[in-house]
A protein has these predicted regions:
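Acidic, metal/ion-coordinating pockets
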Residues: 1-272, 315-327, 337, 472-476
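Feature captures C-terminal
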Residues: 2, 14, 26-30, 106-113, ...
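A structural detector for beta-sheet-dominated domains
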Residues: 6, 255-257, 264-269, 306-308, ...
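Acidic/histidine-rich, surface-exposed loop or edge segments in extracytoplasmic proteins
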Residues: 7, 12-17, 301-309, 462-466
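Short, glycine-/Ser/Thr-/acidic-enriched flexible segments
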Residues: 54, 117, 142-143, 187-188, ...
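Conserved strand-to-helix beginnings and helix N-cap segments that scaffold or border functional pockets
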Residues: 96-97, 276, 462
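Generic alpha-helical structural element
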Residues: 200, 290, 313, 317, ...
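A short C-terminal boundary segment appended to hydrolase-like catalytic domains
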Residues: 256-352, 457
Length: 481
């Protein structure tokens, strides 16, 4: 018997092959259309989504504002008979009501072994019986969510350690399953080889490597969260993570008679353009309503502030970045502003639509104002300046921001002050000066800085903000502001 397993993760609501500006070779409809044809070649199939499914695109932003009985994204996955779902950290961004609306009707398919208090019932694992060959799928979500998420969005929830929870269920799984799959919205914190050398701070955000080090009962780890792209074997365990936004997906084939296992990441850009009509019809009305919403003009500039080269914009500044800083400063009243320019940033034409805003700022981040000393501000700027390196006389990007996962979003620019960094100097000694209104910023004086809730809370990236007093919270999405 041949069983095919398909895994998607971090789709972020990308259904159509578009980023809502240009056509792109990605998205659920292309993946699903392939699966519908491909699964006919096998005796049985198993379809698993590993989270960050219903947040992260213009479509999901639109859906979060609507009163809907059934989330069309979930409806689409159900149309091709997905068997199991894992919750991702971004599933909580729009609050528990949105989460419940999306998953309540399919809660019997949600596998969750480490979140307590969800507004719907889930099971820690499911066992799928294929003519006596039993595959167990246990679901986990990164425990690091409380470090990012607004408290109101995870009220009364408890996030339990992944490794401890697997240990709790391991005996049951071994007794009842021939093949154990960990379905994990989290990634690998160490190198993808037998050495397992740490590649990031060991914060428990990602515990895939820790699972491999502690258990020999796992046959496969289907991961997500990090937006990496790989499929490999570590300690004889298949480990996979498909690219985000539906750019690739995992395919594994198990032959129960020969015990042969084949595996691959399927590159969606190499699939044909055929999309199943019945699947597409599920989204037809939603797409029409979305396009009307996205095309609404909401503002106008005297001239365009388009971003042609995002690297140069990060390096030298740009009117678009200045505008974002001014928005944060105006709405907060803070002395300074810190923000990341997202990879999707394209800037604005003279006329601004809802589409333009959501392309440039796709995340539902809110703002916080912190008290910082001039010394803490300098520490934050020094950290950000490690993004740049000089190699062979040319300015480039520090590999720590590129591997093991791309992290351009961890480079911040700063507004409300004039500052200069010298890239020829060593890390953490690059700030030449910091001035506000023409005067040097005092290292001892207390100022205020506005930044998004993610940066304010996740101080492992910018430790300068650790312990800083929160003086104001602006609980409105930046895209709405």
């Amino acid at each position: 018997m041949k069983i095919v397993i398909y895994q998607t993760s971090d789709l972020h609501g990308y259904i159509y092959p578009t980023n809502y500006v240009n056509d792109q070779p990605l998205g659920f409809l292309k993946i699903a259309s392939y699966i519908l044809n491909d699964e006919k070649n096998y005796d049985a199939s198993l379809k698993i989504d590993c989270g960050d499914l219903v947040q992260g695109s213009a479509l999901t932003h639109f859906l979060s504002k609507q009163a809907i009985d059934e989330n069309p994204i979930i409806k689409g996955l159900e149309a091709i008979n997905y068997n199991a779902y894992v919750l991702g950290n971004h599933e909580f961004n729009y609050g528990l009501n949105y989460l419940k609306n999306a998953y309540d009707k399919i809660s019997d398919k949600v596998i969750n072994a480490n979140i307590k208090g969800l507004p719907f019932n889930t099971k820690p694992y499911k066992v799928f019986d294929f003519n006596g060959f039993k595959i167990g799928c246990i679901g986990f979500t990164t425990v690091y969510i409380p470090n990012w998420e607004q408290e109101a969005n995870i009220k009364d929830l408890e996030f339990l350690d992944v490794v401890k929870q697997y240990a709790k269920y391991e005996k049951e799984l071994k007794e009842n399953c021939d093949f154990i799959i960990v379905c994990y919205h989290g990634g690998f914190e160490k190198s993808l080889d037998e050495n397992m050398t740490p590649t990031e701070a060991l914060t428990k955000e990602n515990q895939g490597s820790e699972l491999l080090e502690n258990f020999d009962s796992i046959n496969m780890i289907l991961s997500g969260h990090q937006h990496r792209s790989f499929i490999t074997k570590i300690k004889d365990v298949i480990c996979s993570q498909p690219m985000h936004n539906g750019q690739s997906f995992t395919k594994v084939v198990i032959d129960t008679e020969s015990n042969d296992i084949s595996y691959e990441l399927v590159d969606v850009s190499k699939l044909n353009d055929d999309i199943d009509d019945k699947l597409e019809n599920i989204f037809t009305q939603t797409k029409k309503d979305l396009e009307v919403y996205l095309d609404k003009i909401i503002g106008e500039f005297d001239k365009d502030i388009k971003v042609d080269d995002i690297f140069l914009a990060r390096l030298k500044g740009h009117p678009f970045i200045n505008f974002l800083h001014q928005v944060q400063l105006d709405v907060s009243g803070a002395d300074f502003s810190a923000l990341s320019v997202f990879d999707s940033a394209m800037g604005f034409s003279k006329k601004i639509s809802v589409r333009d805003v959501l392309i440039n700022y796709p995340y539902p981040n809110t703002l916080k104002v912190l008290e910082v000393t001039g010394e803490k501000l300098k520490e934050a700027i020094e950290k950000s300046a490690t993004y740049f390196v000089i190699e062979d006389g040319k300015i480039g990007i520090n590999k720590d921001f590129l591997h093991p996962k791309v992290q351009h979003y961890n480079y911040d620019t700063f507004g409300g002050l004039e500052y200069k960094i010298d890239l020829s100097r060593d890390f953490y000694d690059r700030v030449v000066y910091m001035k506000k209104d023409g005067e040097d910023i005092s290292m001892d004086k207390i100022y205020t800085i506005v930044l998004n809730n993610y940066r304010a809370s996740n101080t492992s990236i910018y430790p300068a903000y650790k312990g800083c007093k929160v003086v104001k919270e602006i609980n409105l999405d930046m895209s709405e502001i």
